[in-house]
């Protein structure tokens, strides 16, 4: 069984905890990680961008000038794409970009991402992550103790002091364990997890 050191917020070692091999020390399936990120990013897209083509743009029902005898190229409508004020040719239209991924594959992707960070020694476990007051300086001090910059902090319970202390720090995100996802794990590259959050993650992902 995989193990990991447990620290307090000053990076003093306070113990060792066992990790579920299936969740934190399993096979890293990069294709699943890629698929999960692709699905997440696609589902964020609103798909509402739209332009007017020549059928939609207002006006242009009349032929601008007669067919023959003017010496100019024949034209049927002043709202054709090559006219100023004309419709756009092949422009974007509203589209649904949503993709889906089954629950089993989605969980496997999160397990793979966590296993990847564990094997790269980018996973840190704290006994708890509580700040006595709202303090950005105090939060940054904790990150400096662990020599971390781009970091995802995963907690089990809502922690207002922690969330408000971290929200003005660049490249840091505080997330509840139940909202853990592949995109954030890969994006932030380092992850700090509380002991209780580890057990919550294992409970969700091992099933």
Swiss-Prot record:
Disulfide bonds: none annotated. Keywords: Ribonucleoprotein, Ribosomal protein, RNA-binding, rRNA-binding. It holds the Pfam family Ribosomal_L4. SUPFAM superfamilies: Ribosomal protein L4. GO terms for biological process: translation. Gene3D superfamilies: 3.40.1370.10. Signal peptide: none annotated. Belongs to the universal ribosomal protein uL4 family. HAMAP family: Ribosomal_uL4_B. Part of the 50S ribosomal subunit. One of the primary rRNA binding proteins, this protein initially binds near the 5'-end of the 23S rRNA. It is important during the early stages of 50S assembly. It makes multiple contacts with different domains of the 23S rRNA in the assembled 50S subunit and ribosome. Forms part of the polypeptide exit tunnel. This is Large ribosomal subunit protein uL4. The lineage of its organism: Bacteria, Pseudomonadati, Thermodesulfobacteriota, Desulfuromonadia, Geobacterales.
């Amino acid at each position: 069984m995989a193990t990991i050191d447990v620290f307090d917020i000053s990076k003093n070692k306070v113990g060792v905890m066992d990790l579920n091999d299936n969740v934190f020390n399993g096979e890293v399936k990069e294709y699943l990680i890629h698929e999960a990120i692709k699905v997440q990013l696609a589902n964020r897209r609103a798909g509402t961008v739209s332009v007017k083509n020549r059928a939609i743009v207002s006006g242009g029902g009349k032929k601008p000038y007669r067919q023959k005898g003017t010496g100019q190229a024949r034209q049927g409508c002043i709202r054709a794409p090559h006219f100023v004020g004309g419709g756009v040719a092949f422009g974007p239209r509203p589209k649904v970009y949503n993709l889906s991924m089954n629950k089993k594959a989605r969980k496997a992707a999160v397990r793979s991402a966590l296993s990847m960070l564990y094997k790269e020694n980018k996973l840190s476990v704290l006994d708890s992550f509580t700040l006595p007051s709202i303090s950005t300086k105090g939060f940054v001090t904790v990150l400096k103790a662990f020599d971390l910059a781009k970091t995802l902090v995963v907690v089990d319970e809502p922690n207002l002091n922690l969330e408000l202390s971290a929200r003005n720090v660049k490249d840091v995100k505080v997330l509840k364990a139940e909202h853990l996802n592949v995109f954030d794990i890969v994006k932030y590259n380092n992850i700090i997890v509380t002991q209780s959050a580890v057990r919550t993650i294992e409970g969700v992902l091992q099933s």
